[in-house]
């Protein structure tokens, strides 16, 4: 039960971070492309690579904390559902190129960020 509380608390924190970070990104870059969603997903992809690799190589992050961070915080921070909805809206609006770029950049860049997070954790 205690683990669920930690996951819920960090999940709420992740959601708030997503709200504020994506809002800030949209203020800076505008809304012609899903920049805010891409930004939070890139950050989350880097962090999950870092946290998971570091926790596998070290006992510094106990499983309870690892679950709270990955399932809770990063689950709240990142959003596949918003990515899907925004991409669908782009397709629906006839912005096929922007939708394609969003999918391509999101997948390739998120995988790259995860890899970078893993490499950083291995270097620590």
Swiss-Prot record:
Sites where the protein binds Na(+): 75, 78
InterPro entries: FluC
GO cellular component, one term: plasma membrane
Main location (coarse class): membrane
Record GO biological process: cellular detoxification of fluoride
Annotated control of activity: Na(+) is not transported, but it plays an essential structural role and its presence is essential for fluoride channel function.
Keyword line: Cell inner membrane, Cell membrane, Ion channel, Ion transport, Membrane, Metal-binding, Sodium, Transmembrane, Transmembrane helix, Transport
Cystine connections: none
Subcellular location as annotated: Cell inner membrane
Membrane topology summary: Multi-pass membrane protein
Coiled coil: none
Organism: Geobacter sp. (strain M21)
Protein name: Fluoride-specific ion channel FluC
MF term (GO), any: fluoride channel activity
